[in-house]
Amino acid sequence: TECPSASSSWARVDPTRPHPMMTTCTPPSYGPLRSGLGYRAGVGFGFVATVSHVAKRILFGRALASDRLGETLLPIRVALPVFASDALSSVAYATEEIMLVLALGGIALLSGSLWAAAAVAFVMFVVVLSYRQNVHAYPSGGGDYEVATVNLGQNFGLIVASALLVDYVLTVAVSISSAVANLASSFDMLHGHNVPVAIACILGITMMNLRGVKESGTLFAIPVYAFMLAIFTMIIHAAIRLASGDVLRAESSTWDITPADSFSGLALAFLSLRAFTSGCTALTGVEAISNGVPAFRPPKSRNAARTLALLGSIAITMFVGVTVLALVTQVHVAVDDAALVGMPQGYHQKTVIRSEEHTSELQSRLHLVCRLLLEKK
């Protein structure tokens, strides 16, 4: 017999099945909610669109057929903000992390920020070169996990995978915290509300990513490129003013820093190493491109390698530029506000980028930077 209509009460017998009473029938199409329909043989077709299905369609969009997966592959201009946003956004706090550590020894040690930044930049250069080889040797997208598993065994692969999971969680936490801190430096009304704002931003970013890699890439491309433009504009604008003979000083340049202790000899060496490791936050997210090689347009490996080269050159330039500008303008920061001698009562300590922007008279651009940081991946 033929498959019954929606009002019928039974389905046809399938002779290919071992028992003649076992039935199959493909339900009729009821439009875009077809995948959410249900029916029962012997009872009739039930038309129930579940709440979860409707919510999934609204939030995540329509699922793509397998033959349309090629439409989600990313060109370099979109892949850069998608996979490199972690590393690029680290510029917003890597310099500050170095200075906060060195500030424990007082103002005199802040001059070591440039050496720490140079060491971090060199490590980033080496890491980028290494990952450029990885994307050619392991183009399947396994990244560090695949490299460790193939060469060292499954146990080492699991260790690497666990480390990556922890790294991803910390990256989100630190990046969002930095974004909210930059916003709070510009808008006093946000002080005391950092945690709720950060949680709301994480939820928003999660929803954008669940829409799919191409959709999220389009959403992230504009703010990430605008963030890079804002940072480069700030650095170039300050460089032009310095070249013309202007003296740029941060508002915190007249404040003294009370050292937490006296560091010399071995203690100073360990403090310098700690500053270097803190600055290595600038390396966060470099591995994301090697994990996402399958998402690139063909030739996948070559495009991934080019994106890595762009990431390395842009991130190193911005990171070193922000660090040099912080030293030239004599930005003073400390872990504890009480350590800043001369800071006005009730004044909230600003981030390094906020201080630099204020010095170079680019306040409106910093506001843009802070908003962009909240929208990155």
Where are these regions (language model features)?
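Membrane-interface "cap" regions at the ends of multi-pass membrane proteins
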Residues: 38-95, 102, 129, 140, ...
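Hydrophobic, membrane-embedded alpha-helices of multi-pass small-molecule transporters
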Residues: 80-92, 257-301, 305-306
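Extracellular loop-to-transmembrane helix junctions
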Residues: 98-149, 153-161, 174-201, 312-320
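Membrane-water interface regions at transmembrane-helix termini and the short interhelical loops
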Residues: 132-137, 185, 202-224, 294-298
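Membrane-interface loop-to-helix entry segments
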Residues: 205, 210-244, 307-310
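Helix-loop-helix junctions that connect adjacent transmembrane segments
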Residues: 225, 232-284, 342
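Extracellular/periplasmic helix-exit of transmembrane alpha-helices
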Residues: 239-249, 308-349
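Positively charged, low-complexity/disordered segments
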Residues: 361-377
